Curated annotation (Swiss-Prot):
Subcellular location: Cytoplasm
Record InterPro entries: IHF-like_DNA-bd_dom_sf, TraM_DNA-bd, TRelaxosome_TraM
Task of the protein: Conjugative DNA transfer (CDT) is the unidirectional transfer of ssDNA plasmid from a donor to a recipient cell. It is the central mechanism by which antibiotic resistance and virulence factors are propagated in bacterial populations. Part of the relaxosome, which facilitates a site- and strand-specific cut in the origin of transfer by TraI, at the nic site. Probably autoregulates its own expression. Plasmid specificity is conferred by the TraD-TraM pair.
UniProt protein name: Relaxosome protein TraM
Record GO cellular component, one term: cytoplasm
Subunit structure: Homotetramer. 2 homotetramers cooperatively bind to DNA although they do not contact each other; cooperativity is achieved by DNA kinking and unwinding. Part of the relaxosome, a complex composed of plasmid encoded TraI, TraM, TraY and host-encoded IHF which binds to the F plasmid origin of transfer (oriT) in a site- and sequence-specific manner. Interacts with TraD. Also interacts with TraY.
Main localization category: cytoplasm
Amino acid sequence: MARVILYISNDVYDKVNAIVEQRRQEGARDKDISVSGTASMLLELGLRVYEAQMERKESAFNQTEFNKLLLECVVKTQSSVAKILGIESLSPHVSGNPKFEYANMVEDIREKVSSEMERFFPKNDEE
């Protein structure tokens, strides 16, 4: 085991000492608990926390990139569906059926979307 001489503030020393005293009151024997052992345990714990934080910084979730990618996918989907609806409305199999006229399909979609959005984001009376 490596030996390290370390200078700490009186406040830190008092806190480490308080942990040692608490463990002794909980029944730990003097030979099982010491300031040195407790300080070593706290240093190891702090090192693990530090390493975990560094890993999170390296592989951090980028909300802006996620939002950009999500918006791009939504716009592509919206554009694709609009083209498909336009093509479908010109099909001879549905011609003459008002349910499949482009303007009616768009209005129907808007109503359904508005209804679903209202479920999750109720309109305030103030708006």
